[in-house]
Regions:
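Chitinase-like catalytic core of GlcNAc-active glycosidases
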Residues: 1-244, 250-256, 265-285
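Functionally critical loop-and-helix segments that line ligand-binding/catalytic clefts
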Residues: 262
Length: 286
């Protein structure tokens, strides 16, 4: 079954409204660390009652329970576009401790898993103070030790150049070779990344190529797109075009692992979720 995934960050629309939408998985965003406090998790966004120590709001806690009672999974994402290369470099070598801290947060709030939104391109091009592949492999292994399958999910959210062989930043090709079996799926960000941004033909072509990589399959690949033009610097595609130019062609010839969007609060009224969900065979739980 295809998945429909959304990221929940700013809190302008109540999280519990997702119970009436066909999302299979909701990812809360973001946990992160800083250069100044590399081993102390912090929590951002509208879900945070406290940034440090990281604490969810009571409304979020109640919504998580409602979603899970509905058969929907709720994960927390670590990283995000604002986490710096310097912050990552400070936690290298401490992946086990980081994984333990993340697992403690997940079990404290009865969450279903962790998403890694790693966007430090410099760590794949050799210009960072650490090796991004080694870090992600070590962190994924440590997380899977703390969060065993199938009870817990581990997902990653790479940008497409990270999966394009010989792109000069194809670190995730090796990550998937080494620990793909420990990763449940990838939420690939097909936006803010020319030439994929706004180009269905590029997205479909790369989707097919990525699905053939070691450690990957079409079932483990989700296509991530912005809900509105304001949700990304580039890459917006209208709902109708997503269905007719991306989803339908892929499903006609093969398997679509699912769709992801950034972000939940931009889909006021749920039209994106409902239309895209219907096109991949999903209906609202109730």
């Amino acid at each position: 079954m295809s998945k429909l995934v959304t990221y929940y960050n700013d809190g302008t629309i109540a999280l519990d409204t997702a119970t009436s939408l066909p999302y299979t998985d909701i990812i809360l965003a973001f946990l992160y660390t800083t250069e100044q406090e590399p081993l102390s998790l912090q929590l951002g966004g509208g879900i945070a009652a406290s940034q440090s120590p990281p604490e969810l709001t009571q409304t979020t806690i109640e919504a998580i329970a409602a979603l899970q009672a509905n058969g929907q999974k709720v994960l927390i994402s670590f990283g995000g576009g604002d986490m710096s290369s310097e912050a990552y470099s400070k936690i290298v070598g401490n992946e086990t401790e980081l994984a333990q801290s993340i697992a403690t947060f997940i079990t404290q709030y009865s969450l279903d898993g962790i998403d890694i939104d790693f966007e430090d391109t410099s760590s794949f091009t050799g210009t960072a103070a650490y090796n991004g592949v080694d870090f992600l492999v070590n962190l994924t292994n440590a997380l899977r030790t703390e969060l065993p399958s199938p009870q817990y999910l581990i997902t990653h959210a790479p940008q497409p150049p990270y999966l394009e062989v010989d792109s000069g930043m194809d670190g995730y090709v090796e990550v998937m070779q080494q620990v793909g079996d420990s990763i449940d799926w990838l939420n690939v960000q097909f936006y803010n990344n020319p030439p994929w941004s706004g180009d269905p033909s590029e997205i479909i072509s790369s989707y097919q190529l990525f699905s053939e990589l070691s450690g990957l399959s079409s079932e483990k690949l989700l296509i991530g797109l912005p809900v509105t033009v304001n949700d990304a610097g580039s890459g917006y595609i209208s709902i109708d075009d997503i269905v007719s130019e991306i989803i339908d062609p892929i499903q006609k010839d093969g398997v679509l692992g699912g769709m992801m969007n950034w972000q939940f609060s931009s889909d006021n009224g749920g039209n994106w979720a409902t239309t895209i969900g219907t096109s991949i065979g999903l209906e609202a739980p109730n």
